[in-house]
Amino acid sequence: MKKVEEKVILFIEKHRLIEHGDKILVALSGGPDSVFLLHFLQKYKKKYDAEIAAIHINHKLRGNDANEGEKFCKSYCGALNVPFSCVGVDVDSFAKKNKISFEEAGRILRYEIIENHCRKIGFNKIATGHNLTDNSETV
């Protein structure tokens, strides 16, 4: 086992983040944090008798790059044999309608969709690749 994986397992167990039989929905952006998270959880799901699925939110703000990100996430989940869902949202319209920033609109829509999907598929936990340096999400 790699040192980083050992540290993650110790952190999970110290803080009781995963319990036996959890069903965990991973918010998969396609960035390195969420990709590592999905890979790690899929690799160690038997240790926790956990079920893993992933969801990708296409904010449709980056043109073809957004579609490529969606394709990557779908392909990666296929390679890992992880159930995958993708939802497209119109962040621009939501932001304008509610007179808020794109960032705030994206965050509101993203978490609403993820939480609803988690309930819909009967999962009990959501995992994100968010970290302390992701200032726009921390604030």
Task: Describe each model-derived feature in a short phrase.
Residues 1-28, 32-139:
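Core alpha/beta nucleotide-donor-binding catalytic domains of modification enzymes
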